[in-house]
Amino acid sequence: MEQLRKRVVRFTNNDDDDFEPVFLNEQDQDAFVEQLRLTNNRDNRMFSIIFSFLYLLLIVPLFLYPEYWAFKLVELLSLFYCAYVMYFLPLEVGLFNPKTPNKWKFLFILNIGVTALITVLGWSQHTSFFYAFLNIRTLVCGITIFTEIARYSMYHSTLSVEKLDEMRFAHM
């Protein structure tokens, strides 16, 4: 009978003194972790699709202001690159992941660096700092940085579910 002991996880709530702890058996834990994994994968996929289309929609304003075509071309390539990275690359490939090959890290840094350089060059052409800051180039630079931050947080939310999966059946 000792070998048939249930493995349980106890969840407590420190806000209520009268609160009874919730016990989950193996099947409930498996179902709970699988539900978290599915929800996390669905949310990450949804964010990837939304951000990819957002980047492609932001290409339209680039054609509305008359400036250097070389800058526009680099900004277009940067937005296409962000959309590609967000939609096609797995979350494990990122700037902050030590397992990422150096060629991808170089491309991430190059994309951010080139858009930042073009942003600074665009700022130097304007007399008003306020107008220069609200320029579309600043938005493109911000988007490239936001891409890496979003992918970093999406990757770590996936890791959190995996860590929870490893902690199942712990005895309290």
Swiss-Prot record:
Compartments in which it is found: Endoplasmic reticulum membrane
Keywords (A to Z) from UniProt: Endoplasmic reticulum, Membrane, Transmembrane, Transmembrane helix
Full protein name: Uncharacterized membrane protein C660.17c
Coiled-coil ranges per UniProt: none
Protein's UniProt keywords contain Transmembrane: yes
Topology relative to the membrane: Multi-pass membrane protein
Transmembrane domains' residue ranges: 46-66, 76-96, 104-124, 129-149
Origin: domain of life: Eukaryota
GO CC annotation terms, alphabetical: endoplasmic reticulum; endoplasmic reticulum membrane
